[in-house]
Amino acid sequence: MSYILVTGGAGYIGSHTVVELVNNGYNVVVVDNLVNSSYDVIVRIEVLTRKQIPFFKIDLNDHDALDQVFKLYPIQAVLHFAALKAVGESTKFPLNYYSNNVGGAISLLKVMEENNVKNIVFSSSATVYGDATRFENMIPIPEHCPTGPTNPYGETKITIENIIRDVYANDKSWKCAILRYFNPIGAHPSGLIGEDPLGIPNNLLPFLAQVAIGRREKLSVFGSDYNSKDGTPIRDYIHVIDLAKGHIAALNYLFNHKDNGLCREWNLGTGNGSTVFEVFNAFCEAVGKKLPFEVVGRRDGDVLNLTANPKRANTELKWKAQLSINDACKDLWNWTTKNPFGFQINNYSWTKFDSESLTNYDRLNTVRTFNGKFEVSISNHGATIVAAKLNGIKLNLGFDNLKGYLREDNPFFGATIGRVANRISKGDLLINGTHYQVGLNELHRTSLHGGTYGYNKRTFLGPIVKTNEKEKETTMEFVLIDLDGTEGYPGDVETKVIYTVRDTGVGGELGIEYEAKLLEESGRDSTAVSLTNHSYWNIGNQPSIEGTHIKLVSNKHLESNPLDSTPTGKIVTSTDLDSQNSAKLGPDGPVFDYCFVTKQQDKLDTRNDELRVVATATHPKTRIAFTTLTTEPAFQFYTGDGVDVAGVFTKRSGFCLEASRYIYNPKWFIPLNKGEVYGSYTIYRFENF
């Protein structure tokens, strides 16, 4: 299996190209120093492509670190985007630009040569042409136009081009594509990735987008005295998706050029020039209102007209821009409204959860409420609630690192449970008249919580993190693709787990939304899904749950078979609750491990049902009230009497309140058919009283 290395793959153009690479069947490794980007871009690419992307935070000038990536992965080709790219900034800090851009490229080419990797697609720029209007008949600009950059940024690009040409001249086995592109705009139509400049944007549309959402007062138009139809500069604006596809076309061209090496330049543009005001008006139309602007002096290094002649790319690469400026403006506005602060979320942070891994697949993602009272940490491993804290008091049982969750005696602490929660007798799953044998993992008698390789053992993609300061909430969306046949379950299922951390004023709450569906490409038409969270709670800030007062909404629960704890099909009345459906938990009792029912199970998606309080727990020592609300028809209440984690936790260290469907029984079971959606919503609320 070979890989394409993408430098600067967390950047604007690089990230969109990574998506296109994956969509075209390539395996990708990304390196980026994250100076002008965020790792959250990689997270979103993974969710968008449903594929893990190996990532390394590396500066290209670090030869040894870069070389290690080439040693770990069989690199077939390199797409080189990594660079500082602001024209105006380059005039103020030229040495930084030469050191980073040129120095980084030299380091990369050395490592490539040492590892016998001789295919490169270089992200150059139309700025290498400088002011092409100084020549006759050079607008639109062809590749044979004489170069003459007017700023240090452009100089770094032409310098790197010349270095690549020298490398090829010395060794004709190299295959080098130099792509000179013009003004990329827009965003991915999903709204998941787009341009997110850290600090003040240097380009027209990112700045204008921030004006539209109120982050900037007005747009500054740099000069209205150019020799154009409205006095503003002319640029060839190209949708970033078209640009990304141009890189795929160039890469394929290199691979299809079998006989010998090559080094060639191609312009990537639309061939149509637009003025600043024309693009401004198109974006205002997408937004639906006129935006404020003022005309200021020209920007150092800017030229009148940079419009591409893309005929060479059209003919040789079989590539042509398909999307319009209006398309780009609509996609940019979609990205901006969904991500008003880009990837910058102040109350979210992450750390590696698996300290021994070279990748970042297993992370610990932490969100704090805006008042600072409530904090929740979720791992990608099992989309697990690792820690929940109210005013510094930990509310749940868990481990400090991934190793703890991999222990054999881990009783599913905090994990997302699926594909089917709780027990299936003999692993015999009946779906629409067909029997399926699912994995047995409990004394060879039952399938418990999805089997040996249930959702609790899986690494979820994500999270996509978004914040809403007005609603005082932040969401983390995790995604898992569970393939047909895993643990014997039929069908390819996409599962989303969306956690919402919300400020309640006197505390905080954690919402858990589940959504699952069979993928269209799945070869099965039906499957089984039943999801829950298996957190163990302890609100007493002490080793046991002793002294906790519990009040349940129902005293009716499913009767269990004493041999394997699976339901008999009957609903019975609990004898362990008082007349108020309450109980005080002591050191040894009462013992609960029942699936309490609150309503009839008759829906696959309960998210539109009433959100009802089903349980309340309080503790006099901490004066914490823990309320469980759910749309689900049942909940499992378990006092943790079987917990025995050697040297860490003992019985009754915590209790479970798992909002769920009825435990599997053909009598109540509702299958998930293709085209349908499984859904539920639960809230865990923690407040002081």
Swiss-Prot record:
Protein's UniProt keywords contain Endoplasmic reticulum: no
Gene3D superfamilies, sorted: 2.70.98.10, NAD(P)-binding Rossmann-like Domain, UDP-galactose 4-epimerase, domain 1
GO biological process, any: galactose metabolic process
GO CC annotation terms, alphabetical: cytosol
Catalysis performed (reactions): UDP-alpha-D-glucose = UDP-alpha-D-galactose; alpha-D-glucose = beta-D-glucose
SUPFAM superfamilies: Galactose mutarotase-like (SSF74650), NAD(P)-binding Rossmann-fold domains (SSF51735)
Lineage of the organism: Eukaryota, Fungi, Dikarya, Ascomycota, Saccharomycotina
Cofactor: NAD(+)
InterPro entries in the record: Ald1_epimerase_CS, Aldose_1/G6P_1-epimerase, Gal_mutarotase_sf_dom, Galactose_mutarotase-like, GH-type_carb-bd, NAD(P)-bd_dom, NAD(P)-bd_dom_sf, UDP_G4E
Originating gene: GAL10
Protein name as catalogued: Bifunctional protein GAL10
Positions that bind NAD(+): 3-34
Induction remarks: By xylose.
